[in-house]
Amino acid sequence: MQRPVCLLIWLFLLEAQAFEIPINGNSEFAEYSDLVELAPDKLPFVQENGRHQRSLPEESGEETDTVDPVTLYSYKVQSTITSRVATTTIQSKLVNNSPLPQSVVFDVQIPKGAFISNFTMTVNGMTFTSSIKEKTVGRALYSQARAKGKTAGWVRSRTLDMENFNTEVNIPPGAKVQFELHYQEVKWRKLGSYEHKIHLQPGKLAKHLEVNVWIIEPQGMRFLHVPDTFEGHFQGVPVISKGQQKAHVSFKPTVAQQRKCPNCTETAVNGELVVMYDVNREEKAGELEVFNGYFVHFFAPENLDPIPKNILFVIDVSGSMWGIKMKQTVEAMKTILDDLRTDDQFSVVDFNHNVRTWRNDLVSATKTQIADAKRYIEKIQPSGGTNINEALLRAIFILNEASNMGLLNPDSVSLIILVSDGDPTVGELKLSKIQKNVKQSIQDNISLFSLGIGFDVDYDFLKRLSNENRGIAQRIYGNQDTSSQLKKFYNQVSTPLLRNVQFNYPQASVTDVTQNNFHNYFGGSEIVVAGKFDPSKLTEVQSIITATSANTELVLETLSQMDDLEEFLSKDKHADPDFTKKLWAYLTINQLLAERSLAPTAAIKRKITKTILQMSLDHHIVTPLTAMVIENDAGDERMLADSPPQDHSCCSGALYYGTKVASGPIPSWANPSPTPMSAMLAVGAKPLESTPPTHLNQVENDPHFIIYLPKSKRNICFNIDSEPGKILSLVSDPESGIVVNGQLIGAKRAENGKLSTYFGKLGFYFQKEGMKIEISTETITLSSGSSTSRLSWSDTAHLGNSRVLISVKKEKSVTLTLNKELFFSVLLHRVWRKHPVNVDFLGIYAPPIDKFSPRVHGLLGQFMQEPAIHIFNERPGKEPGKPEASMEVKGHKLTVTRGLQKDYRTDIVFGTDVPCWFVHNSGKGFIDGHYKDYFVPQLYSFLKRP
């Protein structure tokens, strides 16, 4: 199963031919004389003639090193991250202070998946610049240079976690050389944070060593952390400054600080500088950033309950897994099994030339079952060959059978995680046939993730296998760290929060959208979608996201203005104004490369190839189809920078490989029927303006009720004068299983000896649907069984199921629809945050319809069955413009006053005046009993009637 090690090493060897650069004047570098005695390392600036001698008397026979032949004058790295798009420049300057020519290698490591965009080199005054060519054209230019006897170099990078960019030049005595490499990448969110790594390996002490990382995130930064990756040697050297939306990390060790020890001539700068951060997320619909004709959509919702998962672990136990690989895999699996949730189902399939199962069916992740599975795994003894085909088909069969028999939770997700270290040696050996078998057998609701351990496995095959079946592949290095790598990957997929996530951009002027349909969304990660739009036709971009959470269908809407970012970006010189364009190109090219590897016909593959090539040339980046030609102005010195072998997966580091689907409008189920505006029962209070008013009017702040009586076509009003914390029953219908209650909150302080109260929280309980909905001034929470979904008022969203629909209008209202015929509207009233008295509060509107049972009651519910009223003897009141009258209702004769109340459904700030007859003394005589009879103990309690 394993290939010869020598072959593996040979594949990673870097070819190089050194430039012979003629001398062209003396070095112009200043202040490097004090570096002459600094000892060199061998990487990344290796001198082939790095040792020279001084003459001694023949009898002594001694040879000694004198000075460092090549001095590293400066080593600078600059990274700017604008909305996850990172652009990095690595620059180094060296001086040959030797009397002999010196060969210098520029060898730096860049992140896997990054696109090289530019490389320049200045050698003794001669400048080499780069251009992007189609790969065959670039190689032809390189071959021509060699054929004509001109100097040519070959630069190749190797496919490891960090790829190497390598070139070599031969510089004459006294000459200077400067290298500068530019690359760009996208930061992918993993386990709740973004991680930016800069590999620092100057190889020797540098007169000037400086690293700067600027981060600009319009969403604002939630945290920023620079972990110690140099074993405490540079403690306190990184300087961090963080604002709300911007941050700067600098790393500038002095020459003394760079030394491994006080008298050492070796540098301690050899490793990775890591910056970790995350951004704020206020909206579940994500952050839609629009700029310069492109948009990017970042989607990472939180506060959602995990979706139960059905998971099959398929583990290679062939002979090649013997030793550290198997030991580390067992340790990882024991931890992973412990992390399963009680509502998960699982089983284990292990295979060599035979296929075995711990359980033939999925079982619940109870403590007993987990303990038994761990004992089974601990007893595994690797041996034999590798039958990947049958192992995968067995796992698929178990999941398919459970689904067909109705044994799976319909709201769950199904995952297969394959762990293998080699190609098949038993059973079906043809990789394309295995790929076809899996594709034909697997159901659309199953995602396949592949983990390839070491380099013996055909990683390209695993990528195609997973990408085609709604998953991804990842390489795991077979060493002492294998266990933590396996656990880290599992943690990334262990918490599915959404299924069937689709991004829709319904406007006709939105084009070239990247993959917008994803099978799952996992907690701690982020989905990114990008596209183009025509600025001359659109002033804003609309998005509609549909998805399924643990207990409900979900629709999220957002709208972004074109000029939202322009002013923000213009104020920061480090912000990249092309970040939207770069991110769109990065996603598009990577997704096209993955599609190209799966293309079913040669014609489709040629079409995709043409698109990738043109985009690579347009955006000046090195991809598997292009090469970078590096030459001087005269064209008589030339190198070729080639890309690594083609990576058939999408977006290195990304957790998702999706598909493209046509965008559509809001689903029909998420469009509630219009609520009659005239026939509503209302509870609310008059708000203050959202901004500081120039003058304040005296208003009634206690909850006021407006009861519309359709038969008599009259509005009757009353107030409830109670205390904060009390919960009032608004609607209680035990027969229909419907509860609506409201909890009172108080003002910040009393005025004129009276503390005003408001509704700060509303509870809706639909008993037959098993659904509870809590609406506060901060969040909207939907609970169904053990699952909970939360939205904030900053979202525009729809969520629900076949019977209950919740529609949230950003910072305005929530509409609840039951069985498409019963409606409740909740309005949010925001007040000026610094107001000394008032607070945010809620108003509720309910239609007086006959959809409730005769037993319905509550302060609103009792009027669903209209009482007979008779208003007569209208007369002047005690206050001008407020006449009084007598009202007979429910056997009582009351004195009522004509006045105006506010309906805020059409005007949330000022409201619409509604004329009504006001009943005094907290509605006494108009409501049944006393208002204190309507107190209930809990937010979802039914009203107990005497």
From Swiss-Prot:
Residues with PTM Aspartate 1-(chondroitin 4-sulfate)-ester: 702
Modified residues (4-carboxyglutamate): 282-283
Tissue: Expressed in both liver and brain.
SUPFAM superfamilies: vWA-like (SSF53300)
Propeptide segments, given as residue ranges: 19-54, 703-946
Stretches assigned to the VIT domain: 56-185
UniProt GO MF annotations: hyaluronic acid binding; serine-type endopeptidase inhibitor activity
PTMs per UniProt: Heavy chains are linked to bikunin via chondroitin 4-sulfate esterified to the alpha-carboxyl of the C-terminal aspartate after propeptide cleavage. Phosphorylated by FAM20C in the extracellular medium.
InterPro entries attached to this UniProt entry: ITI_HC_C (IPR010600), ITIH (IPR050934), VIT (IPR013694), VWF_A (IPR002035), vWFA_dom_sf (IPR036465)
Modified residues (Phosphoserine): 60, 466, 886
Function in brief: May act as a carrier of hyaluronan in serum or as a binding protein between hyaluronan and other matrix protein, including those on cell surfaces in tissues to regulate the localization, synthesis and degradation of hyaluronan which are essential to cells undergoing biological processes.
Subunit field text: I-alpha-I plasma protease inhibitors are assembled from one or two heavy chains (HC) and one light chain, bikunin. Inter-alpha-inhibitor (I-alpha-I) is composed of ITIH1/HC1, ITIH2/HC2 and bikunin.
Protein name per Swiss-Prot or TrEMBL: Inter-alpha-trypsin inhibitor heavy chain H2
Native species: Mus musculus (Mouse)
Lineage: Eukaryota, Metazoa, Chordata, Craniata, Vertebrata
